[in-house]
Amino acid sequence: MALRIEDKKAIVAEVAEQVSSALSAAVADYRGLTVNEMTSLRKQARESGVYLRVVRNNLARLAIKGTDFECLGDALKGPLVLALSKDEPGAAAKLFKSFQKDHNAFEVKNLAMSGELFGPEKLDDFAKLPTREEALATLLNVMQAPVTKFVRTLNEIPSQAVRVFAAVGDSK
């Protein structure tokens, strides 16, 4: 069934709104998947905070025009599902990677982040991106390390003195 112009405008507006706040994007070929498998993918996407939409390529090109994901424009060929990571940059890649393990027909085509287009070989790298909390924890550990080492060094001086006095006391 053909879409009316109003429906097309609504789809473009919805996708453009989601794209404007997305951190990363992934597109995959879904040919060969059953309805139940696509429903399962959509459910997993909702649970992981990923916006997932099957959208016509021309409408997707209009929606991403003028955004960081405009680089995906030439990669939109064939029946594709568009996934946008909203909260965590690697969420869409993690979703596609886990789904691809169980479904051979599902093929990731491209990934995009910060205006750069990446091929499917970067899926593992994107999936390994830390969450915001993990990145903050790592940063905090890096910032705390010198202070912690300094405190341990200061604490070692009295400990060493006690060991010296104990050794002197044991020798007498």
Curated annotation (Swiss-Prot):
NCBIfam families: PRK00099.1-1 (NF000955)
Ribosomal protein listed as a keyword: yes
Lineage of the organism: Bacteria, Pseudomonadati, Pseudomonadota, Gammaproteobacteria, Thiotrichales
Function: Forms part of the ribosomal stalk, playing a central role in the interaction of the ribosome with GTP-bound translation factors.
One of the protein's GO biological processes: translation
Self-association state and partner proteins as the record states: Part of the ribosomal stalk of the 50S ribosomal subunit. The N-terminus interacts with L11 and the large rRNA to form the base of the stalk. The C-terminus forms an elongated spine to which L12 dimers bind in a sequential fashion forming a multimeric L10(L12)X complex.
UniProt-recorded name of the protein: Large ribosomal subunit protein uL10
Family of the protein in this entry: Belongs to the universal ribosomal protein uL10 family.
Superkingdom in the source lineage: Bacteria
GO MF annotations, alphabetized: large ribosomal subunit rRNA binding
Tagged with keyword Metal-binding: no
Pfam family, one: Ribosomal_L10
Keywords of this entry: Ribonucleoprotein, Ribosomal protein, RNA-binding, rRNA-binding
GO cellular component assignments: ribonucleoprotein complex; ribosome
